[in-house]
């Protein structure tokens, strides 16, 4: 199995390992106006100031679960790229079926 990278599939020597930037506190990227727009779409007229942090926390918890399941599907298929179908299946597993993305 010489001449193949870490994965064992494909040809080539496999490039140098890149350093991954440590991501922290990216949940603050979900801005106050973005949360406000989502609430407006849901029919909310007025929003309490404490809602924003609470919404970020709930969203982070929800996405962690979906991403964990999607990555599990990806690893089981021995792939390194998470596909839209992985996310669809992860959502379906959690009882939130999503239509329009195949599967």
UniProtKB/Swiss-Prot annotation:
Post-translational modification as stated in the protein's UniProt record: Glutarylation at Lys-92 (H4K91glu) destabilizes nucleosomes by promoting dissociation of the H2A-H2B dimers from nucleosomes.
Modified residues (N6-glutaryllysine): 92
Residues in the DNA-binding region annotation: 17-21
GO terms of biological process kind: nucleosome assembly
Compartments, as annotated in UniProt: Nucleus; Chromosome
Family, per entry: Belongs to the histone H4 family.
Protein name, per record: Histone H4.1
Gene: hhfA
